[in-house]
């Protein structure tokens, strides 16, 4: 259940980022995971959910990747949601994540790749 919950948090977070932010997120993936570079270049916001869902390990490391991107508020929200045990059902986790993370991404500056 925890794995599914982390997956929902990651995918919800990726739904709420711009294409520029997604490009920066992708810059950290080759260092952390064994993902073909060709797949990363074709990854866009519409395919991110399906492709990243297939890569084992991404969900367990999203917090660290968001910290590298200087998205400290987002990383903190993800940790808080996990620690408070809101992972009862995927739909409740998704609705909480959307309300908290939707505002957190836009306007946060980070290091460019």
Swiss-Prot record:
UniProt domain Pyrin: residue ranges: 1-52
Induction: Up-regulated in response to IFNB1 or virus infection.
GO term, biological process aspect, one: inflammatory response
Tissue: Expressed in monocytic cell lines and primary macrophages but not in B or T cells.
Swiss-Prot/TrEMBL keywords: Inflammatory response
Source species, domain of life: Eukaryota
Subunit structure: Interacts with AIM2; disrupts assembly of the ALR inflammasome complex. Interacts with IFI16. Interacts with NLRP3.
Function: Functions as an inhibitor of DNA virus-induced activation of AIM2-like receptors (ALR) inflammasome through interaction with AIM2.
Protein name listed in UniProt: Pyrin domain-containing protein 5
Organism this protein belongs to: Homo sapiens
